[in-house]
Amino acid sequence: MGSNSSRIGDLPKNEYLKKLSGTESISENDPFWNQLLSFSFPAPTSSSELKLLEEATISVCRSLVENNPRTGNLGALIKVFLSRTKELKLSAECQNHIFIWQTHNALFIICCLLKVFICQMSEEELQLHFTYEEKSPGNYSSDSEDLLEELLCCLMQLITDIPLLDITYEISVEAISTMVVFLSCQLFHKEVLRQSISHKYLMRGPCLPYTSKLVKTLLYNFIRQEKPPPPGAHVFPQQSDGGGLLYGLASGVATGLWTVFTLGGVGSKAAASPELSSPLANQSLLLLLVLANLTDASDAPNPYRQAIMSFKNTQDSSPFPSSIPHAFQINFNSLYTALCEQQTSDQATLLLYTLLHQNSNIRTYMLARTDMENLVLPILEILYHVEERNSHHVYMALIILLILTEDDGFNRSIHEVILKNITWYSERVLTEISLGSLLILVVIRTIQYNMTRTRDKYLHTNCLAALANMSAQFRSLHQYAAQRIISLFSLLSKKHNKVLEQATQSLRGSLSSNDVPLPDYAQDLNVIEEVIRMMLEIINSCLTNSLHHNPNLVYALLYKRDLFEQFRTHPSFQDIMQNIDLVISFFSSRLLQAGAELSVERVLEIIKQGVVALPKDRLKKFPELKFKYVEEEQPEEFFIPYVWSLVYNSAVGLYWNPQDIQLFTMDSD
């Protein structure tokens, strides 16, 4: 490091880093700091270069860990950074590139060191290294400062208060990255942490007042999707004597190591990811999700979650109840637009889920929108490409649909939105289809994919619950959607017969076998019968509540009427089959009266006429199908590993050795 450009491989031999980590105590006023902080790196573009940086940092850290208790150099470095941040706002206003660049470099070094410290030492050791004591001869005072707390407060101030300009973009990203790194102790524990330094510093004390401002800033960073300044946008003149501070291209700021603007981390998934258009937005979103999913402290709820649960629209002029802490307002229209545009990433989908599930103001606002297709279509596209998505992303997309379908207004309005030419739907050309029919098609496709591949009962349950919530409001179903409902039932029926046959053979075999354990076909049969009953309830709900709106479903039902024969007398389905049987019988007799060789158009005409003639009181009333999403007990056991896997795979310019990760299983090394 120091005044010339550096290569990562040379870091352990760098004289400035050797001095920082050595045995000599360096005063915070020493000119050394100006020399140390005047460096630029060629930007690493791969996980192997990030790994190289990590290894180089570990080498420096070993020496620092050994000597810092005597030298206090880490504390001095932090003090240098803290003193500089006090002038940062003024420097931004005065366009003081060099000052901002050096301040950024100080934070970059702190972040690299902190990352290794957190991975390799206990919280107690970590806090000792970040406790600053003034070292002077003959001074044995026990007064000390907690620099970790000061650093975190300073980072929160920096993130929330420094104006976002080309020259401050990098330091804003670095401040957010450093907070992510501070919270990363969770990565190195198998169990979810319920008491940690994160809880100690971020949920009480001087950091607490920044809660709402931080959450608001991170949300606005996500909304704005600010792109980084172009490389080489700022050029510092070199000093003619070649001594002192040689800056070369200011890409100290723009092409530095910290501007690795591709998805960081390792593993095949990350390597294949596209470049990020806004590292600041990505990093902000990841930090927001980590904060929102921290467990409650023993004596206080998570304030970041409280802020996320309670913020309101800037258009809402009603006062906040005094009981709501950390309240703030944000532009819901801008947030909605960003959420619609960013649904290609796991983390944006997880944010949408979090807001819909936890913030009733947002949920009410979204459900009142007249352009819901902008939100629903990206979610359907996630489900449509289920083969390319990880299971967590699919779950989040499904749960979002389930939450939306809890609202009757949503279930009605989606059938009124007509879409043209859905290019990503490749099974069939859909020149015109309602959003409701498309939603049904995609959910049924997800169920069929799950039946043949993953066989995940949880996935089935959520898909069927969403269809059930919608069923009473089905309107003008597209003929293809109606066909797919019945063809799914056909698939389930075949599966039922197959499992029933296997169960029968298994029972015969068990009578003649010598205590050989047999598959539990009874359980399989029970699961498939639950799903079949749910499908029958969905069909029944549509026929009972909106028969006159759905001639295509009646047509599909009549076309495959033989499918339902075996379930008429089945004890598990007799009750729910009554209405379906009645509809089939009623319309079959009408078609019979009309004669043979009927065209599709003529059959539909007879159905439409028959709907008017069918006495509604002959259809038995059933309780309305209504399913509500409820988070399972201890949701943090699912969400915390998920969020950190997203950080691991998607954080900008942050690398963790996969062998050190304890929280989740690695897909690949």
Swiss-Prot record:
CC terms in the record's Gene Ontology section: cytoplasm; Golgi apparatus; membrane
Gene Ontology MF annotations: enzyme binding
Subunit comment: Interacts with GOLM1 and PPIB.
Post-translational modifications reported in the UniProt record: Myristoylated in vitro; myristoylation is not essential for protein targeting to Golgi compartment.
Free-text function comment from the UniProt entry: Necessary for correct organization of Golgi apparatus. Involved in bone development.
Effect caused by changing E87K: In SMC1; does not affect protein localization
Entry protein name: Dymeclin
Entry keyword set: Cytoplasm, Disease variant, Dwarfism, Golgi apparatus, Lipoprotein, Membrane, Myristate
InterPro entries (UniProt xref): Dymeclin (IPR019142)
One Pfam family named in its UniProt record: Dymeclin
Gene it is expressed from: DYM
Main localization (coarse): cytoplasm
Taxonomic placement: Eukaryota, Metazoa, Chordata, Craniata, Vertebrata
Gene Ontology biological process terms in this record: bone development; Golgi organization
Tissue: Expressed in most embryo-fetal and adult tissues. Abundant in primary chondrocytes, osteoblasts, cerebellum, kidney, lung, stomach, heart, pancreas and fetal brain. Very low or no expression in the spleen, thymus, esophagus, bladder and thyroid gland.
Top-level taxon of the source organism: Eukaryota
Localization in the cell: Cytoplasm; Golgi apparatus; Membrane
Protein's membrane topology: Lipid-anchor
Record has Transmembrane helix as a keyword: no
Record-stated family: Belongs to the dymeclin family.
Clinical disorder: Dyggve-Melchior-Clausen syndrome: A rare autosomal recessive disorder belonging to the group of spondyloepimetaphyseal dysplasias. DMC is characterized by progressive short stature with short trunk dwarfism, microcephaly, protruding sternum, and psychomotor retardation. Radiological features include a platyspondyly with double vertebral humps, an epiphyso-metaphyseal dysplasia and lacy pelvis iliac crests. Smith-McCort dysplasia 1: A rare autosomal recessive osteochondrodysplasia with skeletal features identical to those of Dyggve-Melchior-Clausen syndrome, but with normal intelligence and no microcephaly. It is characterized by short limbs and trunk with barrel-shaped chest. The radiographic phenotype includes platyspondyly, generalized abnormalities of the epiphyses and metaphyses, and a distinctive lacy appearance of the iliac crest.
Lipid group attachment sites (N-myristoyl glycine): G2
